Amino acid sequence: MKKFSKIGIVGFKDKSADLANALDQIADWAATHPKVEFFALDSLKGLAKKPIHVIKESGLSRMDLLLAIGGDGTVLSAAHIALGHNIPILGVNAGRVGFLAESRVEGLAKTLDDLLAGDFSTRERMMID
């Protein structure tokens, strides 16, 4: 079972009204789970609160997991970042449809608890060049 101690966050401020809510939930959760560190894409600097760290996109390639908070476009952007690094991606739907997302902002704390407990499954996806 894979352990997630470094989790990257990908999202776009102008694309999702629920992104700030999701980041607040993550910050609250992270404050009570110090063994898990969160690193947000530097474009989220104004929204990400401590203990979430802000880093450049290149730093996300060293994460154990990427949370893509937004819609399908955000998941695809996270896939581009993860390409060649074998990093799993969890899509968190903060939009209307979210075909590629497995979770919703409303249940984010439970999702993080499940990840920490190892209560998850993965699916391999193909990317066409």
Regions found by a protein language model. Give the residues of each.
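Short, acidic/small-residue loops that bind anionic groups at enzyme active sites
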Residues: N86-S103
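Catalytic core of DAGKc-family lipid kinases
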Residues: F99-D129
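Generic secondary-structure boundary/loop-capping signal
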Residues: L66, A94-V97, A117
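N-terminal glycine-/serine-/threonine-rich phosphate-binding loop
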Residues: M1-I69, T74-G84
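Generic internal hydrophobic packing segments that stabilize the cores of diverse globular domains
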Residues: D72-V75, A79, I87, V105, ...
